[in-house]
From Swiss-Prot:
The active site is at 216 (proton acceptor), 220 (lowers pka of active site tyr). GO terms for cellular component: endoplasmic reticulum membrane. GO terms for biological process: 3-keto-sphinganine metabolic process; sphingolipid biosynthetic process. GO terms for molecular function: 3-dehydrosphinganine reductase activity; NADPH binding. This is 3-ketodihydrosphingosine reductase gsl-3. The gene is gsl-3. NADP(+) binds at residues 55, 84, 113, 176, 216, 220, 252, 254.
Amino acid sequence: MNHYLFSESLMEQLKTLSTSWSLPVAAVVAAIGIFATMGLFSSKNHMPVEGRTVLLTGASEGMGRSAAIQLSQKGANVILVSRNVGRLEEALVDVRAAAKNPSTQRFTYISADVSEHDYAAAVLAEAIAWNGGRSPDIVWCVAGMSTPLLWTDDGSMAAARRNMDVNYFGSAEMSRAILREWLAPENSTGPNGEPKHLVFTASMLALFAILGYGPYTPTKWALRGLADTLAMEVNYYPDNPVKVHIVYPGTIVSPGYERENQTKPDITVELEKDEPAESPDTVARRAIAGLEAGKYFVDVSFLGRLMQCGIMGGSPRNNWVLDTLMGWLIPIIYFFVLRGMNSTIVKWAREKGHPFTHPKKK
């Protein structure tokens, strides 16, 4: 079975649970997880990449760079998109060195700012020209940023607009541009054609909000709403098969994480201190495994899997039976988690004084 939960020890995954999650309930969830391994997931690779062309935004560092390298190892042709040409050139060297078939695979980069209006049309035009007149087979929107601040802090609204431009509109513009290519009548392949894949990158904060991420969290909720909408909308074009996916990473040890810590309120650090931080390579590997398993909701940790099931609403399910069972249980867990977090917040405020008096990070 091509999914990390089944290839890695379940106990290792359980170790990543926050101490706020009770062990008895985690044991019940583990039992459900074991049930899930009993033939409920297909072993088919639903997103083969060998010989296909993948375009990734945010590919010069962090998770995007790691994903590009691992896709190269699987035989993909890769187009890297990011702003910084120097980092793109460095990443391109690593991606090319990882090639499964060096004599046939092709690689390039395109410098672009995803926050700029209508950037995607020019990027795709360049990508299509480089790819012999063919659009990329897979587009993965990874580019993102986070500026944690209290909502009452100076600069929070400017940060919110900037986060929305990068995280939401950067992905929204790319998704619209590529879907106009893939779904055009002249590109119809019939319902049995090899599907294209559009991959969004959200965050576990789109499943469970935490104090201090006001400028950031709404951008990922918006992205989830767009992904849910497009997952339904592509069915309106049955002769142009497209699969939509959305990945939910947690904390990734990356340059972006270092930048977000420069403004992160101390109380936010306290609330998320038990959340494990993963390497970009680990997160990319698990995300790719989820995509290959055909998942719409792509989790990259056991905790993320639990959180998804507790807040799926009308989103497409990976597995109706398992997700429904876990969806009954997770709200009970949330009752205790939220009570613990809110208790910490109140205690912190009483000990530290009024938040307006706290020293601000520069």
